[in-house]
């Protein structure tokens, strides 16, 4: 762990520009920082974006992992870095030796992210921890989606906030994203139907349906097939069921974690998606 980050974690304090100690009352926990580093090391993003900086704790975790990627760049935006955080976050990053890989902009995220889309910038990773209001988070994620390459990861902090949870649900239900952590797990019922589908593909159930019992079994078989489609096919559920009735567990969202990671599966067609 970088010495600057290690000092903050061990003392719970940050150092202001004039050398005084200040209680570190904002920032991510160590488990979330290690989760970020695990994601970064697994996917090795070359260009990443961070919304919000404050004291730079999340940025320190990210940059420590990014240092392992050649020619990596981390774009940070925080309109309150000097007015509220007294420049501590950027100072920490410079003291830690990451000045060469960060690009800081003291602009609102909705303005600078829009500028990046106009410049056709592409990114591989994003961390959203700015304004937690639903509209701000939604706009941040919407613009980041335009920048994010398929396979890229978006991590959102403070997932326990209803506003952030609802934004995640929207993107999982309406765009091509899946939840990849933490505590990702399959529904037991879904796993059962997937095992059944595997048996069908292997031909172990087919002969039974061709036997004299076929007439009795077919109605139940149709119910099994449709039940499997209902559980396995997200597009089918979108047509057949209200989105509000899809549970967090079905979307693989964690119950109690304070952060969540979504992976972009592919680019969505803006024209056809609107119909």
Name each model feature, range by range.
Residues 22-275:
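S-adenosylmethionine/decaboxylated-SAM
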Residues 1-28:
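Rossmann-like AdoMet
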């Amino acid at each position: 762990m970088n010495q600057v980050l290690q000092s903050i974690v061990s003392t719970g304090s940050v150092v202001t520009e004039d050398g005084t100690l200040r209680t570190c009352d904002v920032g991510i926990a160590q488990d979330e920082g290690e989760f970020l580093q695990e994601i970064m090391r697994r996917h090795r993003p070359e260009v990443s974006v961070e919304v919000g900086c404050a004291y730079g704790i999340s940025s320190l975790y990210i940059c420590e992992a990014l240092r392992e990627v050649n020619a990596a760049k981390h774009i940070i935006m925080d309109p309150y870095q000097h007015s509220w955080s007294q420049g501590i976050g950027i100072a920490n990053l410079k003291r830690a030796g990451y000045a060469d890989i960060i690009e800081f902009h003291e602009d609102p995220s909705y303005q600078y992210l829009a500028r990046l889309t106009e410049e056709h910038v592409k990114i591989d990773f994003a961390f959203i921890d700015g304004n937690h209001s639903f509209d701000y988070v939604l706009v941040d994620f919407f613009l980041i989606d335009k920048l994010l390459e398929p396979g890229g990861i978006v991590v959102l902090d403070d997932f326990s906030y209803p506003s952030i949870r609802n934004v995640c649900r929207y993107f999982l239900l309406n765009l091509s994203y899946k939840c990849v952590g933490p505590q990702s797990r399959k529904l037991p019922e879904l796993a059962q139907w997937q095992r059944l589908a595997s048996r069908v593909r292997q031909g172990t159930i087919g002969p039974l349906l061709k036997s004299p019992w076929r007439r009795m079994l077919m109605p139940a078989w149709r119910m099994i097939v449709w039940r499997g489609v209902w559980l396995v096919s997200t597009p089918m559920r979108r047509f057949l069921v209200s989105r509000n009735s899809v549970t967090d567990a079905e979307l693989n969202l964690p119950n109690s974690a304070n952060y969540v990671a979504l992976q972009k599966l592919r680019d969505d067609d803006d024209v056809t998606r609107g119909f």
